[in-house]
Amino acid sequence: MAKSLRSKWKRKMRAEKRKKNAPKELSRLKSILKIDGDVLMKDVQEIATVVEPKHCQEKTQCVVKDETDDMKMETDIKRNKKTLLDQHGQYPIWMNQRQRKRLKAKRERKKGKSKVKAMKAAKGLTW
């Protein structure tokens, strides 16, 4: 379905508006975080000791690296790279119906040609 000029224009104008308002939005968000952050930090400091952010980042990076090593996904889906079919004969989710139909027809044409060749070869041998 084609995109109308109106929708293209509206999208363009929204993008320009976002560019124009981005600095204001950023400063507003920063001010909100600054106000709320100070209040929370004061409450936390009364209860417990606060660690500097650099130490926290280093520790979390080490923990994240360890977790990623352990979490390797095992995919049970095995695909034929040439036909893109999996072991159950299903195409990938991202492939649209027209592509699926086209590939299926192409595959059937190849099967038909091989059957015809086999029939001709068999006829040639029988006489």
UniProtKB/Swiss-Prot annotation:
A GO term from the CC aspect: nucleolus
Q: What does this protein do?
A: In hippocampal neurons, regulates dendritic and spine growth and synaptic transmission.
| Ranges of Basic residues composition bias in the record | 1-21, 98-120
The GO molecular function terms of this record are: basal RNA polymerase II transcription machinery binding
Source domain of life: Eukaryota
Q: Which UniProt keywords apply?
A: Chromosome, Isopeptide bond, Nucleus, Ubl conjugation
Cross-link Glycyl lysine isopeptide (Lys-Gly) (interchain with G-Cter in SUMO2) position reads K65, K72
GO biological process terms held by the UniProt record? dendrite extension
Q: Where is this region: Disordered?
A: 1-24, 98-127
- According to its UniProt record, where is this protein located? Nucleus, Nucleolus; Chromosome
Subunit details for this protein? Interacts with CTCF, MYO1C and with the transcriptional machinery, including RNA polymerase II and TBP.
Provenance organism = Bos taurus
Q: Which family does it belong to?
A: Belongs to the learning-associated protein family.
Q: What is its main location?
A: nucleus
Q: Which InterPro entries match?
A: LLPH-like (IPR018784)
Q: What is this protein called?
A: Protein LLP homolog
> Is this entry keyworded Ribonucleoprotein?
no
